[in-house]
Structure formats: C-alpha cells, structure tokens
Amino acid sequence: MQRHLLLGLAGLPALLSAQRVSVTCSFATVAANGETCDSMAATWGLDTATFQSLNPKAKCPEVIGGEQYCVVGTVTTVTGEPTTAPATTSTQTTTTTTTEVTSTTVPGNGITTPVPVQPNLVSNCNKFYFVNKGDNCADITARYNLDLSDFLEWNPKAGNSCSGLWANAYACVSVIGYVPKPKPKPTSTSTKPPTATGNGIPTPLPTQPGMTDGCNKFYLVKPGETCADIASRNGVSLSDFLQWNPHAGNACSGLWANAYACLGMVAFSLKSRFRVDCTGDAHNVVNIAGDQGQCINTDCSVGSLEIAAAGVCPDGEVQISYWEQPGCQGKWFGYGYAKRGECRGLWTNGWKFKAMHLRCAKSQDDCVNKGSCAYDPEPAQGVC
C-alpha cells in the first residue's frame, strides 16, 4: 500500500516553483550605433545587471543601434505554484517582488543621483532639475541664476543650441564646489527723470547695470520679461541686445525689471571744435544713428572733429564729405576719413567749405576710389 502511494505521487507533475518577470517601462531611449549594454547602463547611471533586468530580451553585451531600450522602469517578479497542481490543491501561494529603478549613487562622490539623467552628465553634479517638456536651457539657467556656459559644461549633450536637451530627464544645475551667484536686484523701482550723459543723449533712469555708452534708444523692462522677448518685440538681435546690456548675461538672469535697457546704439557721436586740435568752443554736438548720416553746417567756425569712441560704425570708420555751401549744397570737394575715438583736423583747416556730410563708410567703397565719380577742384581762396 505504501509502495502504491509512492508510485502515484511519483506520477504527478513536479511541484516546482515557476517565475514570471514583468517590466513596466517608464522611459526608453534609442541606442546609438556602437553602444553596448555596459555603455548605455553607465550613461544612465545604472549597473549592467539592472539594465539587463529592465531589458530581459537584450542580448548583452551587445545592443542594436536604432532599437529602443528601457532605462527607467519597474521590474516585477512573480513566484507561484504551477498551474498543473493537483485538484486537491485549493490555494495558490504567490510572492511578488517589485524592483523600481528610481535612483542610483554615483560611485566616488556619495551623491544620490536621480534617473534618468541627461546623457554624459558630469560625475560631480550635486543638484538636479527634472526637465519638463517645453523647457529650454535659457529657462533653466534663468531659474537657477546660472551662466549658460556653466550649464552646458555640466550638461554637454545639450549643445550650444540646446537641441540635445532631453525632456523627462534630470539636468545638472550645480556641481561640488560651485558657489551660486547672488541674483542682483535693482536698488530702486522708481523711474527717475532723464539725465544727459557725456554724449549728449538724454538717458532715462534707472538703467541696466553696465549698460553700454552711446545708447540712443531705451526700453523699460517689465517684471517677467526676458531678453529674447524684448529683442524680438523690438526688432533687434539677441546678440546685440546682450552686447548693449552685458549685465543681463547669456542666461538673461542679470536683467533688472523696472530699469531701462538699451535697444539701439548711435553710429557715432562727435563735437565740432573751433581749433584744429579739438580745443576751443564746441560748435556742434551730434549723435548720428543709422547708416544714412547727417549734414552739419560749420558756419566757418569748425577746424576739427572730436569723435567719441563709442558707436557701431563698421571698423570705426567715419566718412567726411566736404561741401561748399550750407545744407551740403554747391560744389563738392571730396571725402576725408576719421576713426572713432580720435581728434580729426579738417581739410583746409575749415576755411574752404561751409558744410559736411558725416556717415559710417569705408574708404575703399567710395565712388572716388572706385573711379565712378570726381570731386570739384579746391577753390583758390577760402569761402569763409
């Protein structure tokens, strides 16, 4: 009887435990050609075993370029009795083990690093920001008062155009030893009356810190506005705006609300002086904008031009066109040239002309040098 029972039991299927593994992937990425399980795991702050558990069908150590692989997810292991258990078994015992890949510790620095992170994130990062869809590098750097150059150094995959920044992954916003910059605030939010600067241009106050000299167009920055908003709305390039308002910084984190920003520069500024060495009375104080220039009358009282260094003339070159009569009329006596930031004595010490047309221009581009025009001969006597 005992033997019969043993034989009957021996004929039953083996009651071996069965395991099922289920992966719920929260974030997957495409493998590049040449990558391996090890390299992808390292990029995303995982060990290879965890990477394999998230990708049970992967044939490590190789991965297939162009295929998607899970790098953030939940691994669930179910252990239970086989479905071929005897009919007398009425209860199935199930054990569920869940492994959720949420963070890892970067070896060597002891900092708990959330995953997923931006590809090639620096290893000494100690502060992280989860990039949401629609975020860009400028938004993030402005939020944390960072220089764009620092952010791109810590998150190199983003690239200079920020096109490589991944949404739904953590970016680095500080590293070990980095000292955050204090965010500057304007000392006053009231608008002061304009003041005349050394170039004679009425300038409203307060202005952005470090605003360039020679500005002739201003904009009162409202709370919440960004450099890109202001530049786009006013038809200037962002690079020019940042050059004229350097304290704003590449991330625009240094832009002050309730203070005036520069939106345009004079081409050049000058004072016409009585003597040929830029001394004596100033007859004209002129700020010339744009590329069309301006005619000024000398009234026989100008022997030199004191030209300011500030301005946007290409290569700093200012063209002086000499005319016989006021209003740049009558005979034309040709061109002279000067540089911004110099004293320029005038042709015939100012005695044989009564007007000058001044503009930005390069000598090699004028009609005389190109042979397409001719000027009138110098008069034998002065016209003054």
UniProtKB/Swiss-Prot annotation:
Keyword Kinase appears in the UniProt entry: no
Biased composition (Low complexity): 81-106, 186-195
Induction pattern: Expressed during in vivo infection of insect hosts.
PROSITE patterns on file: LYSM (PS51782)
SMART domains: LysM (SM00257)
Keywords (A to Z) from UniProt: Chitin-binding, Repeat, Signal, Virulence
Signal peptide limits: 1-18
Pfam family, one: LysM
Domain LysM residue range list: 27-71, 127-173, 217-263
Gene3D superfamilies in the cross-refs: LysM domain
Knocked-out gene: effects: Does not affect virulence to host insects.
Gene Ontology molecular functions: chitin binding
Disordered, as annotated region: 81-112, 183-206
Additional facts recorded: In plants, chitin acts as a microbe-associated molecular pattern (MAMP) that is recognized by lysin motif (LysM)-containing plant cell surface-localized pattern recognition receptors (PRRs) that activate a plethora of downstream immune responses.
Assigned protein family: Belongs to the secreted LysM effector family.
Comment field on protein domains: The LysM (lysin motif) domains are small globular domains involved in binding chitin in eukaryotes. Blys7 contains 3 LysM domains.
Function noted in UniProt: Might have a role in sequestration of chitin oligosaccharides (breakdown products of fungal cell walls that are released during invasion and act as triggers of host immunity) to dampen host defense.
Name under which the protein is recorded: Secreted LysM effector Blys7
Organism: Beauveria bassiana (strain ARSEF 2860) (White muscardine disease fungus)
